[in-house]
Design a protein with these regions (language model features):
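N-terminal beta1-alpha1-beta2 module of alpha/beta enzyme domains
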Residues: 1-80, 164, 178-185, 368
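An alpha-helical appendage that flanks or caps ligand/catalytic pockets
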Residues: 2-16, 131, 138-181, 212-324, ...
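Acidic (Asp/Glu)-rich catalytic clusters
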Residues: 2-5, 42-46, 75-82, 104, ...
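Alpha-helix-loop-beta-strand connector modules within alpha/beta enzyme cores
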Residues: 64-88, 144-148, 231, 342-360
Length: 370
């Protein structure tokens, strides 16, 4: 089955940190508590979401004063769901691959193969300094992350595993039991730099990119897939999007404007300063948010840029347009998570599936007439 024949998948950001997904003083009927997140996870899997992504934060800032740890929180959500796969974010440095491999293999065993990992290379030096962790320069963080991923996959698939890298070494190590998922637990990563894209094209199963226009996303997809093909590797693409689905376009745009009008200016500017400092440390001297305006930065991962804001029909058409340029998954954020996840499942997702089916039939007709 080709990429275009595969139904596009949906994930959501788990609000396991306080403050929601917008740096705004607007009312958010979203809660970082465990009870709320259990209800959200159960609603999400009933409404067509296949993945959930927990966040990893060690320090407060930009509205996130409280943060639950990602791996244990992921496991807790898996215990209360039946189908949802939860992606636990992990930072090389605080986590060592031997511990992560065993921890995740155990969770995989306990949850019948529903854990995944998002390897976060890190962009905020202040957080690493606060917890006493080494802060390698930009490209070296990706060298470390690539070794981390290679060793995880090696441990999960090989007995008597040995590895001699710059950051990690193993000698004849055998992990038992190994994960239930075959060939191994899925590995996600993000980042927009050359080093991030190159790493994705060599070792990751999934690559998350910040929100952007269809045209810009297409450029990234083509770049990564071209590199991956040269490496005899396959990687899937997920795109961040903050979804505002309402009965009318005017309602949706009014919500967006209210979010921006009520932005926490001090926190947004501080986030912008931190991202520019981080970007300047990369070889390209720009990072994920180099072209992001103040309005874009109100949503951490440029989710407004993806423009899934409007009526269910408008959003469904834009999702299929993203699929047509090679996107495999939409990583979604919402203002009021539970009620909007339910609205999405009821109003938007059926339209997406109808458009996919219609497009597939058109392709079949064209193929027969060719």
């Amino acid at each position: 089955m080709t990429q275009l024949q595969q139904p596009i998948k949906f994930a959501y950001w788990v609000p396991n940190v306080s403050g929601g997904l917008v740096v705004s003083n607007i009312e958010q009927r979203t809660d970082w508590s465990y009870d709320y997140n259990v209800r959200l996870a159960q609603a999400a899997e009933k409404n067509g979401f296949e993945y959930a992504l927990t966040q990893i934060r060690f320090t407060a800032g930009y509205g996130a004063e409280n943060q639950h740890e990602s791996v244990s929180f992921s496991h807790a959500l898996l215990a209360k769901t039946e189908k949802l796969k939860v992606i636990a974010a992990i930072l090389p440095g605080p986590w060592k691959p031997a511990l992560a491999a065993k921890q995740l293999a155990t969770i995989d065993y306990l949850t019948e193969g529903r854990i995944a990992i998002n390897v976060v290379s890190g962009w905020f030096r202040g957080e690493f300094d606060a917890i006493g962790e080494e802060w390698p320069e930009h490209d070296q963080r990706y060298v470390r992350s690539e070794e981390f991923i290679r060793t995880l996959k090696g441990i999960w698939t090989t007995d008597n595993y040995s590895f001699d890298g710059k950051y990690y070494q193993f000698q004849n190590y055998t992990l038992k039991p190994k994960p239930l998922q075959k060939p191994h637990i899925e590995v996600f990563q993000g980042g927009s730099s050359r080093a991030a894209r190159d790493m994705a094209s060599r070792v990751s199963d999934w690559y998350f990119t910040n929100g952007n226009t269809v045209e810009e996303i297409q450029k990234q997809v083509e770049d990564i897939r071209t590199k991956a093909k040269a490496n005899n590797h396959q990687v899937k693409i997920g795109v961040n999007a903050f979804i505002i689905a309402r009965d009318t376009e005017e309602e949706a745009k009014a919500v967006l404007q209210e979010i921006i009008d009520k932005a926490n200016t001090e926190a947004v500017n501080a986030f912008g300063d931190a991202t520019r400092e981080a970007g300047a440390a990369s070889p390209e001297q720009q990072g994920n948010w180099a072209k992001s305006s103040f309005e874009d930065l109100v949503q951490y991962n440029d989710g407004f840029k993806t423009n899934l804001i409007g009526t269910p029909q408008q959003i469904a058409e834009r999702i299929v347009a993203l699929k047509n340029v090679g996107v495999d998954l939409i990583l979604s954020g919402f203002l009021h998570f539970i009620e909007e996840v339910e609205y999405f499942g009821e109003k938007v997702l059926p339209l997406v599936r109808q458009l996919e089916l219609q497009q597939e039939k058109e392709v079949e007709i064209q193929a027969k007439s060719a």
